[in-house]
Amino acid sequence: MALTKADLAETLFEKVGLSKRDAKETVEVFFEEIKQALESGEQVKLSGFGNFDLREKSERPGRNPKTGEDIPISARRVVTFKPGQKLKARVENLPVEK
């Protein structure tokens, strides 16, 4: 199961007491701020959670899996996430499901 923006809004509604409309808008604004910061080339640091960064990937050779033809993969910018120490510690202590 995945955590969705709707789930986050529902949690704000239940635990913080925001109206459902305000809770949904708060979640949307939060993610929009992160998107805008990244689009501006800024790092996003969420204390106790982790950091979002942009990384440049240079052009590299690739191959079309259907035809086997060599094709270049163009240079691009990608978003990376590095979890913070507190998040790492909480996740590392979870039991492994088999």
Curated annotation (Swiss-Prot):
On assembly, the entry states:
Heterodimer of an alpha and a beta chain.
Task: Write out the ranges of the annotated region (Disordered).
Answer: 53-73
InterPro entries, from UniProt?
Hist_DNA-bd, Histone-like_DNA-bd_CS, IHF-like_DNA-bd_dom_sf, IHF_alpha
Name the residue ranges with Basic and acidic residues bias.
53-69
Q: Which family does it belong to?
A: Belongs to the bacterial histone-like protein family.
Which top-rank group of organisms is this from? Bacteria
What PANTHER family does the record tag this protein with? DNA-BINDING PROTEIN HU, INTEGRATION HOST FACTOR SUBUNIT ALPHA
What Pfam families does UniProt report for this protein, alphabetically? Bac_DNA_binding
One annotated GO biological process: positive regulation of metabolic process
UniProt keywords, alphabetically: DNA recombination, DNA-binding, Transcription, Transcription regulation, Translation regulation
Q: What is this protein called?
A: Integration host factor subunit alpha
* GO terms of molecular function: DNA binding; structural constituent of chromatin
Q: Which SUPFAM superfamilies match?
A: IHF-like DNA-binding proteins (SSF47729)
- The protein's organism comes out as Aliivibrio fischeri (strain ATCC 700601 / ES114) (Vibrio fischeri)
Q: What does this protein do?
A: This protein is one of the two subunits of integration host factor, a specific DNA-binding protein that functions in genetic recombination as well as in transcriptional and translational control.
KW Transcription (keyword) present: yes
Gene Ontology annotations for the cellular component aspect, listed alphabetically: cytosol
Read off the PROSITE patterns from this record: HISTONE_LIKE (PS00045)
